[in-house]
A protein has these predicted regions:
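Catalytic core regions of nucleotide second-messenger enzymes
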Residues: 36-37, 41-44, 74-92, 161-163, ...
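Helical mechanochemical/support elements of P-loop NTPase systems and associated helical scaffolds
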Residues: 18, 25, 44, 61, ...
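Catalytic NTP-binding/metal-coordinating core of nucleotidyl cyclase/transferase enzymes
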Residues: 1-67
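Catalytic strand-loop-helix junctions within cyclic-nucleotide turnover domains
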Residues: 51-61, 91-110, 130-131
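Catalytic/regulatory signature loops of cyclic-dinucleotide turnover enzymes
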Residues: 79-80, 94, 116-141
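Short, surface-exposed loop/helix-turn segments at secondary-structure junctions
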Residues: 103-115, 148-154
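Cytosolic regulatory/linker segments at or just downstream of nucleotide-handling modules
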Residues: 98, 127-188
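Cytosolic nucleotide-binding catalytic cores of signal-transduction proteins
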Residues: 46-47, 69-78, 105, 114, ...
Length: 188
């Protein structure tokens, strides 16, 4: 997750206000993640990385990740109705194998995930429009085998996208929330 329009806002505000706004949003968003069984891996400036299916196994991790993403987007849209400083989120989700564990040195060690799966999720987030959720075809395939409520969520094919640093493109889908939008086609 990354806040799409945070840098221009941060340029206009005092540092204390920037920290307060970020911390307020992080408190709200990370509670959604933890309630869904996600692991908050790290906060990086105006974004954060979440793991599902590690460190705790979850058979429906793709559904949990998408439901969390939808809940976070809903929360941001709702918060923007009453807050002076409006933010947008960009969320990229990809599923696959990753190197997961304690990585670092004796001075600084972090439990984290690294590898192509992590990089692909980040690259998906980078091509998102504000308030958009993009998922890879790998995540989409897992969702089709899990219990995601098709009455509230649809997946819109976005075609094959070339992501920075990858030798070949990947099929991408946007996640549309029928609670926020009426312009969508149900998931098949």
């Amino acid at each position: 997750l990354d806040f799409a329009n945070f840098t221009p806002l941060a340029e206009q505000l005092a540092p204390d206000d920037v920290v307060r706004i970020l911390n307020d949003y992080y408190a709200l968003l990370t509670s959604i993640v933890t309630e869904a069984g996600g692991y908050l891996d790290k906060i990086m400036g105006d974004g954060f990385m979440v793991l599902y299916n590690a460190p705790v196994f979850s058979i429906d991790h793709a559904t949990r990740a998408v439901q969390s993403a939808i809940a976070m987007r809903r929360l941001i849209v709702e918060a923007n109705r009453t807050r002076a400083h409006k933010l947008s989120v960009r969320i990229g989700l990809h599923s696959g194998e990753a190197v997961v564990g304690n990585i670092g040195t004796s001075i600084l060690m972090n439990y984290t995930a690294i590898g192509d799966t992590v990089n692909t999720a980040k690259r998906l987030e980078e091509i998102c429009e504000p308030d958009q959720i993009l998922i890879s075809s790998d995540t989409y395939a897992l969702l089709k085998g899990e219990e995601l409520d098709p009455r509230n969520v649809v997946m819109q094919p976005q075609g094959r996208k070339q992501l920075k640093g990858r030798s070949s493109g990947i099929e991408v889908f946007s996640v549309e929330d029928l609670m926020l939008s009426v312009h969508a086609t149900p998931m098949h």
